[in-house]
Swiss-Prot record:
Entry GO terms, CC: bacterial microcompartment
Protein name: Bacterial microcompartment assembly protein PduM
Self-association and partners: Interacts with shell protein PduK.
Origin species: Citrobacter freundii
Protein location: Bacterial microcompartment
Gene name of the record: pduM
GO MF term list: structural molecule activity
Length: 163
């Protein structure tokens, strides 16, 4: 292989990697079922799943291998694809916080506000101090310290406890 050919190959690889780094795929749940996981991993650096429903979130948390959408999401995460899931605000009290918080997923509501899942039993000031707005979803029996409660008010963070 001569130097010119090698240089062209390197430039093509770099070009494709740059293109992938800047590309995001936005899909509905129905469209996600139809996409090939390999295509997603090779061509996109991030996936935005629009309006996920509660059964899908529960299956993602459980790692259900029967649902192709769940398999695609887990394969994308394994390949290093950033996965952002938007969901309706009304679903927040019912989502499986502990299990979803273990996965490297990003969440937002229908208005684009960031949703942070807090799986611990105690919410302290340190947990709230890093937030600037958005929604913080807590477990059912999470204790909120007084300092954290004050910080929630000053940082424009909305607290939601699970049902």
């Amino acid at each position: 292989m001569n130097n010119e050919l090698l240089q062209r190959i390197i430039e093509e690889v770099v070009s494709r990697l740059k293109k992938r780094a800047e590309s995001t795929l936005s899909l509905s749940v129905a469209q996600l079922r139809e996409i090939e996981p390999r295509t997603l991993c090779c061509q996109y650096s991030s996936l935005h799943l629009l309006q996920a429903d509660l059964p899908l979130l529960e299956q993602i948390a459980e790692g259900c291998a029967d649902n192709m959408s769940v398999v695609t999401i887990h394969e994308a995460l394994a390949c290093g694809v950033r996965v952002k899931i938007s969901l309706q605000h009304r679903l927040l009290p019912a989502i499986p916080v502990r299990k979803l918080a273990r996965l490297p997923l990003e969440f937002s509501d229908e208005l684009g506000r960031i949703i942070v899942l807090h799986p611990d039993k105690l919410l302290s000031y340190a947990d709230v101090a890093q937030l600037k707005g958005g929604v913080l979803v807590l477990r059912r029996r999470c204790v909120v310290t007084a300092l954290a409660q004050d910080a929630v008010g000053t940082r424009n963070v909305q607290l939601i406890k699970q049902e």
